[in-house]
Amino acid sequence: MYRLLAPAKINLFLQIIGNCLDGSGYHELVMVMQAVSLMDRLELIPRRDREIKVHCTNPAVPCDQRNLAYKAAALLQQHFPDRDGVEIFIEKRIPLGAGLAGGSTNAAAVLVGLDLLWQLGLTQGELQTLAAQLGADVPFCLQGGTALALGRGEQLTPLADLQGLTVILGKYRSLSVATPWAYQTYRQEFAATYAQTPSEQEKARQEGGSAILLQAIQQHDIAPLAANLRNDLEKVVLPRYPLVAELKEQFLAAGAIASMMSGSGPTVFALAPSADEGYRIMQRVRRALPDPDLDLWVCECCPHGIQLETS
């Protein structure tokens, strides 16, 4: 039996360059991803048959073949058909449909856990290759920390960690944004601005502002980091979901050094220089927005990906 901790992720930077030139239908992206200390907890127990069973504390999570944790186990079973099944228990703390990679981080945890449980001896590179088959965010969730992600998100470069920086998360429980809708709507509205050739895409990458952010991360310089956050998907999500736009404004009004929507939303994150200030900001936002449907968390930037839970 293995217990694992699976961190959520936020996007500090999300630039849509254009369509991938391989004809896959995906977008070419420049992202800076950050793991945070809001974590799901997974427990993997071996079975004596070939079945994969998933259980979750959140009844809204599908526990069948639609679940990414299930898909991760099934993928490993395809590669290692002599292995038995597994019972997967997910204690869900990361909200659903939130732009926080909750499903992807569960899949990454299953890859790590089954590598140990089944004594597969997979290298980090082999785990990353499997992760990329499951979804664009799964390779990052495996690695965690702070990383530059190119392509669909699978081309990862580790960056200096941002330990000590506090992150406040806010999400309306009843609100979710479908990631495919966000990207498809962006394509419909902004396709005319897409970089069409390799040279155009490289130029867009160079001019998109990520270099300033990367330098700020390297130097742990919070002011230019906060000033150079970017999420292109805000252009389509915020007009459609005014609650998300208002939450971002309230974080800034409460004293956050920066605030932005994460991924395709609807989660909004804010940055604070300390945990004490993070809790003060959370309390101010709670007073300004007393809606019981709004969940708020204070967490830290996390320097790692999937970890074994030590008792």
Swiss-Prot record:
Belongs to the GHMP kinase family. IspE subfamily. The gene is ispE. NCBIfam families: ispE. It comes from the Bacteria. ATP binds at P95, L96, G97, A98, G99, L100, A101, G102, G103, S104, T105. GO terms for biological process: isopentenyl diphosphate biosynthetic process, methylerythritol 4-phosphate pathway; terpenoid biosynthetic process. The active site is at K9, D137. This is 4-diphosphocytidyl-2-C-methyl-D-erythritol kinase. InterPro entries: GHMP_kinase_C_dom, GHMP_kinase_C_sf, GHMP_kinase_N_dom, IspE, Ribosomal_Su5_D2-typ_SF, Ribsml_uS5_D2-typ_fold_subgr. It comes from Thermosynechococcus vestitus (strain NIES-2133 / IAM M-273 / BP-1). Catalyzes the phosphorylation of the position 2 hydroxy group of 4-diphosphocytidyl-2C-methyl-D-erythritol. Its EC number is 2.7.1.148. Gene3D superfamilies: 3.30.230.10, GHMP kinase, C-terminal domain (3.30.70.890). Pathway: Isoprenoid biosynthesis; isopentenyl diphosphate biosynthesis via DXP pathway; isopentenyl diphosphate from 1-deoxy-D-xylulose 5-phosphate: step 3/6. The lineage of its organism: Bacteria, Bacillati, Cyanobacteriota, Cyanophyceae, Acaryochloridales. The keyword Kinase applies. It catalyses: 4-CDP-2-C-methyl-D-erythritol + ATP = 4-CDP-2-C-methyl-D-erythritol 2-phosphate + ADP + H(+). GO terms for molecular function: 4-(cytidine 5'-diphospho)-2-C-methyl-D-erythritol kinase activity; ATP binding. Keywords: ATP-binding, Isoprene biosynthesis, Kinase, Nucleotide-binding, Transferase. The keyword Nucleotide-binding applies.
